């Protein structure tokens, strides 16, 4: 009867050995997961400003920001855009929009026509004479 009692003990030992292996694997996988998280956190951190004004090859490849900005010419800074006029200013300009377009621009167009007519008359006279 001693042999059957030894068999379960050996089966328990064989079960314990793989569990220790799996626990080691779990620890390794957790460490790898932590390393992966650290790498991702470093990847998503904003790039630090590099104030080196030089555009030589060495300085262009100095860091990732320099490469993007100087080497590739990519700049992610916000460009200055037109600001919309405030609503109060629009209310004042609406009184000017009540007038028709012809009355607003009519005077300026007639002045331009008057100044151009003598010049065009001289040019046509010269063109005919030659």
UniProtKB/Swiss-Prot annotation:
It comes from Human immunodeficiency virus type 2 subtype A (isolate KR) (HIV-2). The lineage of its organism: Viruses, Riboviria, Pararnavirae, Artverviricota, Revtraviricetes. Its main location: host cell. Residues 80-91 have a biased composition (Basic residues). Residues 92-102 have a biased composition (Low complexity). Residues 67-77 are annotated as: Core. The phosphorylation by CDK9 does not seem to be important for transactivation function. The gene is tat. Residues 11-24 have a biased composition (Polar residues). GO terms for cellular component: host cell nucleolus. This is Protein Tat.
């Amino acid at each position: 009867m001693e042999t059957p009692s030894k068999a379960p003990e050996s089966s328990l030992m064989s079960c314990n050995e793989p569990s220790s292996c799996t626990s080691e694997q779990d620890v390794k996988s957790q460490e790898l997961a932590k390393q992966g998280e650290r790498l991702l956190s470093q990847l998503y951190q904003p790039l630090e400003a590099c104030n080196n004004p030089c555009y030589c090859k060495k300085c262009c490849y100095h860091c990732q920001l320099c490469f993007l900005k100087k080497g590739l010419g990519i700049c992610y800074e916000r460009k200055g855009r037109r600001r919309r006029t405030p609503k109060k200013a629009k209310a004042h300009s609406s009184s000017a929009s009540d007038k028709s377009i012809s009355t607003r621009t009519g005077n300026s167009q007639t002045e331009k026509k008057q100044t151009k007519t003598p010049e065009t008359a001289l040019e046509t006279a010269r063109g005919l004479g030659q």
